């Protein structure tokens, strides 16, 4: 009962924050199985797609990578006062950022499967490559955080004239269809990330 009450309150809170009405539900006896479906109608000229990145666009993110990974680790170690735990248990939706960049970003993806793995989806969909400046990536613990999932940040590409101080510039889109990792600090990483199948 307590778990159900907490879950219901969480759904109610989120639906209120994002103004998404809860319009139905179905209860049956059996193993716990929760599915949530959200329907909406997009503004066609403001849809953020994976495709659309152009040669010369800058690759950006808006926060440190690896925060959720650190939160999970702290949770497993019993560090209940860690500020990173909420990044793992209660990730914030990037709706406001999405709205902010919807008219300037040429492509976009969330980083739930790991920054480099998800960036690869943009590059493949856009038929381009990238130079990634490893020294510029704001990581939480170490450079391997760029392969950590569950961060739910947005990785996006934008032309130079739309850059903002609040964006971390981590690379540049290139015509060459490969990914070149650049580091003067000697960082050496492989592109991994979560694989669904």
Where do the language-model regions lie?
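Glycine-rich anion-binding loops of enzyme active sites
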Residues: 1-73, 172
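Short, conserved charged micro-motifs
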Residues: 2, 47, 160-166
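Short, ordered loop/turn segments at secondary-structure junctions
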Residues: 27-28, 64, 113-114, 135-137, ...
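Active-site glycine-rich loop that binds ribose-phosphate moieties when present
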Residues: 36-49, 82-100
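Short hydrophobic/aromatic beta-strand micro-patches
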Residues: 39-41, 155-159
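Short, compositionally biased
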Residues: 69-87
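Active-site-proximal betaalpha loop/short-helix elements
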Residues: 88-151
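Acidic, Ser/Thr/Pro-rich beta/coil linker or hinge segments at domain junctions
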Residues: 89-92, 164-197
């Amino acid at each position: 009962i307590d778990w159900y009450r907490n879950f219901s309150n969480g759904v109610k809170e989120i639906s209120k924050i994002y103004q998404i009405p809860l319009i139905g539900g179905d209860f049956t006896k059996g193993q716990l199985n929760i599915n949530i479906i959200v329907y909406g109608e997009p503004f066609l000229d403001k849809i953020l797609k994976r495709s659309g990145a152009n040669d010369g666009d800058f690759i950006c993110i808006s926060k440190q990578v690896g925060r959720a990974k650190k939160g999970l680790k702290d949770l497993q170690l019993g560090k209940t006062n860690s500020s990173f735990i909420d990044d793992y248990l209660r990730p914030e939706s990037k709706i406001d950022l999405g709205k902010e960049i919807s008219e300037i970003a040429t492509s976009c993806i969330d980083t739930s499967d790991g920054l480099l793995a998800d960036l690869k989806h943009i590059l493949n969909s856009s038929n381009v490559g990238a130079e990634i400046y490893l020294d510029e990536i704001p990581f939480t613990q170490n450079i391997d955080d760029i392969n950590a999932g569950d961060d739910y940040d947005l990785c996006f590409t934008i032309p130079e004239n739309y850059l903002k101080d609040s964006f971390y510039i981590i690379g540049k889109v290139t015509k060459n269809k490969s990914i070149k990792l650049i580091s003067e600090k000697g960082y050496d990483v492989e592109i991994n990330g979560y694989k669904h199948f």
